[in-house]
């Protein structure tokens, strides 16, 4: 992992400086997201997360930032990841996604995306974990 250049303060400052609206909308997947008026999405900077970018693109809305946090999305919908990444102004990928990507995808991520250190690791709950949290 020593060759990974993680997002830093300068990158964050650049993202902030490149905003075109005062407000930024974080657009997630789900039925309530689609209740957001298109007029609002068209006039604000939008951060799309995982598969939510499809809805935006289907309405000709380019996301300010595309964020991929779920490695399963990359494995199951790789072509969509590339499409969403290439059609957004910026792409941020969680390091967990990078670590589980193919070598080809890792090269793409390092060349075209900002890589974010993990705040937490997604874990599957097993019997021991469930017992641990119930005690």
Each model region followed by its residue ranges:
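Acidic/Gly/His-enriched mid-domain segments of enzyme catalytic cores or analogous surface patches
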Residues: 42-45, 51-135
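N-terminal donor/sugar-recognition subdomains of glycan-related enzymes
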Residues: 1-26, 31-43, 58, 86-91, ...
